[in-house]
Design a protein with these regions (language model features):
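Positively charged, low-complexity intrinsically disordered leader regions
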Residues: 1-37
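A near-ubiquitous, low-amplitude feature marking generic local secondary-structure context
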Residues: 2-6, 10, 44, 70-73, ...
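YjeF_N-associated NAD(P)HX repair module
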Residues: 3-4, 105-190
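Residue-level detector of flexible, active-site-proximal loop/helix-junction positions
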Residues: 9, 75, 100-101, 151, ...
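General N-terminal targeting signals
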Residues: 14, 19, 85-87, 176, ...
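Nucleotide and nucleotide-moiety/phosphate-recognizing core
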Residues: 28-115, 121-147
């Protein structure tokens, strides 16, 4: 579904960079809607465009006073070109967010690990980061915001989001039987 929408946008002359900026801004609106007080934002980044969406959102939320931490599955140099261009030293990279001492306020984990092209089982490094997110949610009261789909939806160790922000449309897989455990509340980003 989403890939067809992106292809249509590209056919109209919209660039991938503009789509990423638009998606990131939409994620910002969702975070502001559910978490009105700035706190700590941990962005979980894969190497693809979902990471870029998360970085755009984090850049803007930082302006609101959010402290931004990053958990990376690959070094920034190994990210695709577009997300790599949004990465900067304003992201405090941490080795294990479970050991991080967060400032007062909400702790929001932004799931930018896997995008709409994922299927099958997650690789071990991604599964470990997804498990870390779930641990923080269960044991430290962190809140998970997924973008489009919770990473690994349908796989073991999938992210268990509190909110899934759907860019452009709600994907069919999000409303299938059993998905509610991972999807949480749905928020549409127009």
């Amino acid at each position: 579904q989403m890939q067809k929408g992106e292809e249509a946008a590209f056919a109209r002359g919209v660039s991938a960079a503009a789509l990423m900026e638009e998606a990131g801004q939409g994620i910002v609106a969702v975070v502001r809607q559910f978490y009105s007080i700035a706190g700590s934002l941990v962005i979980y980044l894969g190497k693809g465009n979902n990471a870029g969406d998360a970085l755009v959102a984090a850049r803007e939320l930082r302006k609101d006073g959010w402290k931004v931490f990053g958990r990376l599955c690959v070094p920034p140099a190994e990210m695709k070109e577009l997300p790599r261009g949004h990465f900067g030293d304003w992201v405090e990279v941490v080795e294990d967010a479970r050991k991080q001492v967060f400032a007062p306020g909400p702790v929001v984990l932004l799931d930018g690990l896997l995008g709409i092209g994922f299927s099958g089982e997650m690789k071990a490094d991604i599964a470990a980061l997804a498990s870390e997110m779930n641990d923080l949610r269960q044991h430290q009261h962190a809140h998970i915001v997924a973008m489009d789909l919770p990473s690994g939806l349908g796989a073991r160790h999938a992210v268990e989001a509190d909110v899934t922000a759907c860019v452009a449309q709600i994907k069919d897989v999000l409303v299938e039987d059993g998905a509610d455990r991972n999807v949480g509340r749905l928020a549409l980003v127009p």
